[in-house]
Amino acid sequence: MLTYNIHWVGVPAGRALMRFYTPAQDVFRIEVEIESTGAAGFFYPLLDRIAITGARDGQKLQTLHYEKLQVKEKGRFTEQVFDRDKGVVIRALNHGKPEVLKQVGPEVNEPITALYVARAREAFSAGEEIEIPVVNGQQNYVGRMVVHPREELETPLGRFAVIPVSVHLKKSELFKQERAIQVWFTDDERRLPVRVETDVRIGFMAADLIAFDDGRGHKRDSR
């Protein structure tokens, strides 16, 4: 479980929770909840819940089902089913008529799982560009993750050796993507994303990791 404090244009704006677990040896599940609070909650009310289920083979992950509930947007519900046998993604909005998207390859996932796969690489080299095949809404494309030189980063949980990366994705429902998403992963086998910076619909958002439980007996909480 990862817990984040979110700042919007420099002021406290909300919280985010992310959980990755394996209910069975060959199955993974990711759960995300993002909620805006305070002034940000007034100007940009947000309560999104995302659930992803997929197949797991070691570090290889394949999304099979994705759903997103946008509570503050009149309960807008998005569902995607990845039919891996046919190589297509079936998408439905608000339980309406399903729409078959373009053909997708076996390595294509939605953005969250795609980033989990990219960060699980055994080694990162400064200057390296990693391709990220994604389907995002109606878009099917190859994003990029650019690796930057290692550095030290002070966080609410203390100081970490980190690997900064820039993630280049196309515009989506949440991200404006006028610039790349910046992520700082811990430089260890956990690759914890301790800080994330991105553009959103109205302004700039930063998320700092304030608590984690990696499921291996390591946990820390700054609260």
Please report, for each region that a protein language model flagged, where it lies by residue:
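Hydrophobic, well-structured mid-protein blocks that either form specific transmembrane helices
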Residues: 77-121
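Acidic, serine/threonine-rich low-complexity disordered tracts
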Residues: 1-84, 121-223
